Design a protein with these regions (language model features):
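Hot-dog-fold acyl-thioester-processing enzymes
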Residues: 1-55, 110-132
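Hydrophobic beta-strand-centered segment that forms part of the acyl-chain substrate-binding groove
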Residues: 37-72, 77-79, 98
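HotDog/MaoC-like acyl-thioester-processing domains
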Residues: 65-67, 78-132
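Broad hydrophobic/π-residue packing in well-ordered secondary structure
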Residues: 12, 18, 26-29, 60, ...
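Residue-level recognition of well-ordered beta-strand positions that form the cores
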Residues: 7-9, 57-59, 74-76, 90, ...
Length: 132
């Protein structure tokens, strides 16, 4: 099984009044990793991908600070449904896990806005890349 990783810079604007990365920014880090995954692994043109985030849950383990410089975000596929993919993520600083997350994406028919089967080429790439 292969895990996709993306290095994301910690920006000054990510820091809140407590001096660490604001909790909402973790979802942005995960989104940045996911969009890179779509481009790098699925070779998908994001302007042509009709997929929405149906749910996300994040468990925070330790704060991330500006001085950490960057985080590594992992992307794994835990489950493939007919029209959905459940992805798991870790946000890491070095070897330390700062957060763990699970996100479910749903493929939509761009005409109706209703769930539609995942594109076969995306399903095949995810199965191959992650050994599903």
């Amino acid at each position: 099984m292969t895990t996709y990783t993306a290095e994301i810079d910690v920006r000054f604007r990510d820091i809140d009044a407590m001096g660490h990365v604001n909790n909402a920014v973790y979802a942005t880090y995960i989104e940045q990793a996911r969009t890179r995954y779509f481009s790098d692994v699925l070779d998908a043109d994001l302007s042509g991908v009709s997929t929405v985030l149906a749910s996300i849950s994040i468990d925070f383990r330790r704060p991330v600070e500006l001085s950490d410089g960057e985080v590594t975000v992992t992307v794994d596929v835990a489950d493939l449904g007919r029209s959905s993919a459940t992805m798991t993520h870790e946000v890491r600083v070095g070897d330390a896990v700062a957060a763990e997350a699970e996100a479910t994406l749903v493929s939509l028919d761009p005409e109706t806005g209703k769930p539609a089967p995942l594109p076969e080429e995306h399903r095949a790439e995810m199965e191959s890349y992650h050994g599903l």
